[in-house]
């Protein structure tokens, strides 16, 4: 079985906490194949692992958030999403009946800059729907910019090639404060 761990800013770069748990899981299942999809700030972290990777880690894919290609927004050449693409985006933002196959297809096949997407009409309308349905007591401009900030790293990661695996597990810390 191929198991892909998706880890942001922890394993295999830093010791302790989530990283220790991931390392223990990999070592305790030597007959399973593990793939790491790591999300780090920039290329300075590339290959600088705090752990010696076990033999059953067969691939490490590093995603560098600093590599975001903003592109430019051309006001005369606005990119509009078709109905299926818009529904995929909207369902993701509303976290309602997300059709992941459509989401992945959209981010892998649509040639659009993150800047065009986040500053475009379609993202605006999907966020406006979320705002009206769930958060009308918040100042809309604050909500819109917060959503842009939150979705930028997710959209960037969705645009990268996801390694093939049988199981995907995103590891994270949970802060109770």
What role is predicted for each listed range?
Residues 1-119:
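N-terminal subdomain of nucleotide-sugar transferases
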Residues 2-5, 9, 148, 160-164:
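General secondary-structure edge motif
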Residues 12-14, 144-148, 167-169:
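Short, flexible loop segments at the rims of nucleotide/cofactor-binding pockets, characterized by
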Residues 22, 175-176:
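Short, well-ordered alpha-helical microsegments
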Residues 96-162:
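Long, low-complexity, polar/charged, intrinsically disordered or flexibly structured peripheral segments
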Residues 159-175:
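Short N-terminal targeting/anchoring amphipathic segment
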């Amino acid at each position: 079985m191929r198991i892909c761990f998706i880890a942001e800013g922890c394993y295999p770069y830093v010791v302790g906490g989530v990283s220790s748990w991931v390392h223990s899981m990999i070592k305790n299942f030597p007959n399973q194949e593990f793939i790491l999809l790591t999300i780090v700030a920039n290329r300075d972290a590339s290959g600088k692992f705090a752990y010696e990777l076990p033999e059953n880690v067969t691939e490490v894919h590093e995603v560098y958030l600093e590599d975001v290609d903003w592109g430019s927004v051309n006001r005369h050449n606005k990119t509009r999403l078709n109905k299926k693409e818009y529904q995929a985006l909207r369902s993701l933002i509303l976290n309602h009946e997300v059709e992941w196959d459509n989401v992945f297809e959209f981010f892998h096949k649509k040639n659009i800059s993150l800047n065009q997407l986040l500053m475009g009409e379609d993202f605006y309308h999907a966020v406006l729907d979320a705002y009206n349905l769930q958060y009308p007591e918040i100042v809309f401009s604050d909500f819109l910019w917060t959503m842009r900030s939150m979705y930028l790293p997710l959209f960037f990661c969705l645009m990268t090639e996801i390694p093939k695996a049988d199981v995907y597990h995103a590891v994270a810390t949970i802060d109770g404060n």
